[in-house]
C-alpha cells in the first residue's frame, strides 16, 4: 500500500472571510498533501474536507463568520429544474443552430442524454467536450485570466501563471487502481475549435467533485455555470458515479443559492458526518435559525445550534494556542481515540519512513500533531498516512 504523505499546518485563523468580506475571522484545520490517494480524499470529503491545489482544509462552522456545509447531489435521482432546462435549450440552439428536439419522456436523465448527445455528435470542429489531465497550458491560462478579471474583477497583475497552476493544475491525488479513471482532470469545452470553458474536476470512487469552473466571459449570457453543472451530472451518470459534489454551501451567501436548485441535494451534518436532505436545514434557516445547525440524532429531532459567533471578540485565548479540540471543530474523533491511533501512524524523515514508536522517542513534541491529524481525518485515513517531518 502506498501511504499518503501529509504535512501538518494545524489550526488556522484567517483575518478575513473570503465569502462574506465582513472583516470577521474564519477558522479551519489544515494540512498540505504531497500525495493523497483518491480513496482517502473521498473519505475526507465525506468528513467535510476540501482541497485547493495541495492544501486540504476542514472549516469550523461553529466559530467562523460563515458556516460551510459540504453539499452533494444524488445523480441517480436527479430532477432537472425549469431554469436548468431553459439554459440547456438556449445553449443547444446556439451550438446546433436549431432548437432541441422535443421528447416524450419526462425523465431528467433522458433530457440530459438527448441534449448533450445532440450537440456532442456534431463533430469536434463544431463542438466538443473532452477530458484531459489537469496540466498547465497558455490557452487555459488566458481564458482563466480573462474570467477572473471580468467576472471576479481581479487586477491583471494579481493573476499569475504560478497562482493558476497552484490553484487549478497542481493536485496531490493519485490512483493505485490504474483500471479506473480516478484523479484530477480538466473538462474542456470547445465551440468551433475555441476553448470557451474549463471545468476542474476530481473523479473519486463514489462521485464527481467539482473544484472550479472558468469560462470566456463573452459567453456569459449562456449560463455556462448551469450548463457545466448539468454536463458534470451527466458525466457522473454516464460513468457510474453516484454523487456529484458541488463544494460548500453557505445559506447566507447569495452566490451559492444556485446550488440548492439541484435536486435531490444533501448537506453533510457537521456533528455526525451523516448526509441529510438540504430541505431539513433550509426550512430552519428560512425561519430564523442560527447559521450553524447540527442534527444530533438519526431522527433529526435533536437540533444543536451555535449563536452567531465573532471570533474577533474572543480575547480569552491566544490564537497561537488554538487547537481543533479547544475550538470544538465539529465531526472529529475524541482525544482518546485519536491518541490510540498514533501507534499506527508513520513519519517521513528524509527518504525514510519510520513507525511513530521510533520517531516519538526522539521527537516527543510532535505527538500532538499526530493526535490532531488523526482526530480530523478519521480512523480509516489515520491508518494510511505518513507525516512528513523533513524532506
UniProtKB/Swiss-Prot annotation:
InterPro entries cross-referenced by the UniProt entry: Acyl_CoA_acyltransferase, N-end_Aminoacyl_Trfase, N-end_Aminoacyl_Trfase_C, N-end_Aminoacyl_Trfase_N
Keyword vocabulary terms for this entry: Acyltransferase, Cytoplasm, Nucleus, Transferase, Ubl conjugation pathway
Gene Ontology annotations for the cellular component aspect, listed alphabetically: cytoplasm; cytosol; nucleus
EC number: 2.3.2.8
The UniProt record lists the keyword Transferase: yes
Family matches, as Pfam families: ATE_C (PF04377), ATE_N (PF04376)
GO terms for MF: arginyl-tRNA--protein transferase activity
Keyword Acyltransferase: yes
Catalytic activity: an N-terminal L-alpha-aminoacyl-[protein] + L-arginyl-tRNA(Arg) = an N-terminal L-arginyl-L-aminoacyl-[protein] + tRNA(Arg) + H(+)
GO biological process annotation, one example: ubiquitin-dependent protein catabolic process via the N-end rule pathway
Broad class of enzyme this protein falls into: transferase
Its job: Involved in the post-translational conjugation of arginine to the N-terminal aspartate or glutamate of a protein. This arginylation is required for degradation of the protein via the ubiquitin pathway. Does not arginylate cysteine residues.
Recorded family membership: Belongs to the R-transferase family.
Name of the protein: Arginyl-tRNA--protein transferase 1
Lineage of producing organism: Eukaryota, Fungi, Dikarya, Ascomycota, Taphrinomycotina
Amino acid at each position: 500500500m502506498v501511504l499518503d504523505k501529509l504535512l501538518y499546518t494545524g489550526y488556522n485563523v484567517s483575518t478575513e472571510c473570503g465569502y462574506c468580506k465582513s472583516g470577521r475571522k474564519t477558522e479551519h484545520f489544515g494540512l498540505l498533501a504531497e500525495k493523497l490517494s483518491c480513496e482517502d480524499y473521498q473519505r475526507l470529503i465525506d468528513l467535510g474536507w476540501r482541497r485547493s491545489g495541495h492544501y486540504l482544509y476542514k472549516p469550523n462552522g461553529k466559530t467562523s463568520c460563515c458556516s460551510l456545509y459540504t453539499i452533494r447531489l444524488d445523480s441517480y435521482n436527479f430532477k432537472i429544474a425549469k431554469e436548468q432546462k431553459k439554459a440547456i435549450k438556449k445553449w443547444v440552439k446556439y451550438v446546433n443552430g436549431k432548437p432541441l428536439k422535443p421528447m416524450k419522456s419526462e425523465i431528467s436523465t433522458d433530457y440530459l442524454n438527448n441534449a448533450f448527445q445532440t450537440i456532442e455528435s456534431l463533430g469536434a470542429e463544431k463542438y466538443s467536450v473532452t477530458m484531459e489531465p489537469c496540466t498547465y497550458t497558455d490557452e487555459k491560462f488566458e481564458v482563466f485570466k480573462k474570467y477572473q478579471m471580468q467576472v471576479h474583477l481581479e487586477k491583471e497583475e494579481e493573476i499569475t501563471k504560478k497562482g493558476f497552476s497552484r490553484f487549478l493544475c497542481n493536485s496531490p491525488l493519485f490512483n493505485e487502481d490504474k483500471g479506473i479513471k480516478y484523479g484530477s482532470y480538466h473538462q474542456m469545452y470547445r465551440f468551433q475549435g475555441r476553448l470557451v470553458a474549463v471545468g476542474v474536476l476530481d473523479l473519486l470512487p463514489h462521485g464527481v467533485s467539482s473544484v472550479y469552473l472558468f469560462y470566456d466571459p463573452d459567453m456569459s449570457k449562456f449560463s455556462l455555470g448551469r450548463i457545466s453543472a448539468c454536463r458534470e451530472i451527466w458525466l457522473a451518470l454516464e460513468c457510474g458515479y453516484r454523487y456529484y459534489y458541488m463544494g460548500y454551501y453557505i445559506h447566507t451567501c447569495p452566490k451559492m443559492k444556485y446550488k440548492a436548485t439541484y435536486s435531490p441535494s444533501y448537506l453533510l451534518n457537521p456533528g455526525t458526518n451523516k448526509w441529510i436532505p438540504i430541505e431539513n436545514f433550509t426550512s430552519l434557516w428560512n425561519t430564523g435559525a442560527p447559521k450553524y445547525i447540527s442534527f444530533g440524532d438519526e431522527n433529526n429531532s435533536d437540533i444543536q445550534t451555535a449563536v452567531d459567533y465573532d471570533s474577533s471578540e474572543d480575547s480569552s485565548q491566544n490564537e497561537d494556542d488554538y487547537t481543533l479540540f479547544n475550538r470544538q471543530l465539529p465531526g472529529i474523533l475524541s482525544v482518546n481515540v485519536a491518541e490510540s491511533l498514533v501507534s499506527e501512524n508513520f513519519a517521513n524523515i528524509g527518504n525514510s519512513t519510520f513507525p511513530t514508536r521510533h520517531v516519538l522517542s526522539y521527537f516527543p513534541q510532535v505527538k500532538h500533531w499526530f493526535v490532531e491529524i488523526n482526530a480530523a481525518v478519521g480512523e480509516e485515513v489515520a491508518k494510511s498516512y505518513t507525516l512528513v517531518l523533513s524532506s
